[in-house]
Structure formats: C-alpha cells, structure tokens
C-alpha cells in the first residue's frame, strides 16, 4: 500500500458515510494525483461543507495544505487553526510540544505514526496545529504519520460507540436504527438507479420503502415491525444489479 493510499484510507475512515464522503474521496484522489492545485478554492469548499465536525475539517485542511503546492505567503485558515488547538486545553498543548520534539527526530511515516499513537487525540490535534501554524517543521511523511495516528484514535472511539449502538438491547433504539438504515439504503438505490426500465422498478421499491418508514414514524409502530426491512431492500437492489449485469458484493 502506498503512503498516499494509506493516508486516504485513514482520513476517510473518520468521515460519515453519505454523498459528501464520496465527494471528499474524489477531492483527495485529485489532490494526491496533483490534479487539484488551487489550495485557496479547496479550503473555501471544505469550510462550507455541512455535517463534518470541526476536527474532521481541520484534519482535511491540514492534509490539503501539506499536499497542494502553495505560495509561501498564503494565509493560514482560521477554521483549521481553531479545530487544531486541542480545545484550548494547556495540557494538550504541553503534550503536543513534547510529541513535536520526538517527531522532529523522526524521518519515517510509520515511525512517526508509532510514536504518535501513544498520545491522546487532543494532543495529536494540537501537534498538527503547531505544524500548521508554522511553529514547527517536520517532513511531509512524518506529518502524514501524525495525521493517520489521529484518525486511528478517532475511528477507534467511533467504532466503540457504533458497536455499543449495534449491540444495544433497547428495542426502541434498534427499531429506529433499522428504519434509518432502510431509509439510507433506499436513498442509495435511487441514486444508483439511472434511467432504464429496470431503474423505474428499483426507484419504485426505494420510494415505497421510504414512504413505509415515514408512515411507521408518523403513527408509531411496534419495535419488531422494522425487522428485515433493510435486508428486503438489499435483496431488491441485488436483483436489480443482476438484471443490469452488475456484479457487486453484498454491502450489508
């Protein structure tokens, strides 16, 4: 796996699923391929994206700044600086300075990542802030190691939270989660459908599913009534893909 592929993997792991994630993935690919060289326009685009947390925007802004060649005097962006200040906690800043001193002596991506993984996400973000604000300088490889360690810390906590929700025994939470997943799957089906005859059928199935979820929410239904909703939709989607000659793995 190449360095940039690894960076892209880690960064995308902290971006919520949805159309925006696909858009961000495309921007990262373009940036890493040297196709997008207007850093200012890229940062303006990032700043106005909805849904993303300030920290995720800060990390993406840091990655774009590291990768896209820019004029020396280009102003640092406030939204990135604010996101990478470790919540203003002086303890985070102290740890960030200690980490920075270690990273300065490091020259490899994996070495930097290994060192950084023993620090909290707050300290890692603060250390990125130091580098972003030009208070410290490390090699691009080392900076990417720091980015990936930060993303790993964030993804770990997101995974723990997600696992808690998936394994919860609360029937109301499970019911709502199934309906949200069914609704999201229906939306994906509509986006994939295109304009063929079979597409009309897929659109109809997706539309009915969304209406059913809306009705279930409006009138209130038994927590078990949503069981199998997403699976039924996915079976329909796979049948549609087969007719269209598209072979895709299940994405349950």
From Swiss-Prot:
Q: What is its main location?
A: virion
Q: Does the keyword RNA-binding apply?
A: yes
Q: Name one GO biological process term.
A: viral budding from plasma membrane
This protein is called what? Matrix protein 1
Q: Which GO terms describe its molecular function?
A: RNA binding; structural constituent of virion
Q: Which keywords does this chain's UniProt record carry?
A: Host nucleus, Membrane, RNA-binding, Viral matrix protein, Virion
Quaternary structure and partners:
Homodimer and homomultimer. Interacts with NEP. Binds ribonucleocapsid by both interacting with genomic RNA and NP protein. May interact with HA and NA. Cannot bind NP without genomic RNA.
- A Pfam family per the record: Flu_M1
Family per similarity comment: Belongs to the influenza viruses Matrix protein M1 family.
Q: State the species of origin.
A: Influenza A virus (strain A/Fort Warren/1/1950 H1N1)
- Additional notes on this entry: Most abundant protein in virion. When expressed alone can form virus-like particles in transfected cells.
């Amino acid at each position: 796996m190449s360095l940039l592929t690894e960076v892209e993997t880690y960064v995308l792991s902290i971006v919520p699923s949805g159309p925006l994630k696909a858009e961000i993935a495309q921007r990262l690919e373009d940036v890493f391929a040297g196709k997008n060289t207007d850093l200012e326009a890229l940062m303006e685009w990032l700043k106005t994206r909805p849904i993303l947390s300030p920290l995720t925007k800060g990390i993406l802004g840091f990655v774009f700044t590291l990768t896209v060649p820019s004029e020396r005097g280009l102003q640092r962006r406030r939204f990135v600086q604010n996101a990478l200040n470790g919540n203003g906690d002086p303890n985070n800043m102290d740890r960030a300075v200690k980490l920075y001193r270690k990273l300065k002596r490091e020259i490899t991506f994996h070495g930097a990542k290994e060192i950084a993984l023993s620090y909290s996400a707050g300290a890692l973000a603060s250390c990125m802030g130091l580098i972003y604000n030009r208070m410290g300088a490390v090699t691009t490889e080392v900076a990417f190691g720091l980015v990936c360690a930060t993303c790993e810390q964030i993804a770990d906590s997101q995974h723990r939270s997600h696992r808690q929700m998936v394994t919860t025994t609360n029937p109301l939470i499970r019911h709502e989660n199934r309906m949200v997943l069914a609704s999201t799957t229906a939306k994906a089906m509509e986006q994939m459908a295109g304009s063929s005859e079979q597409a009309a059928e897929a659109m109809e199935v997706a539309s009915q599913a969304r209406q059913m979820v809306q009705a279930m929410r409006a009138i209130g239904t038994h927590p078990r009534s949503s069981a199998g909703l997403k699976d039924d939709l996915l079976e329909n989607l796979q049948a549609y893909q087969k007719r269209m000659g598209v072979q895709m793995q299940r994405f349950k």
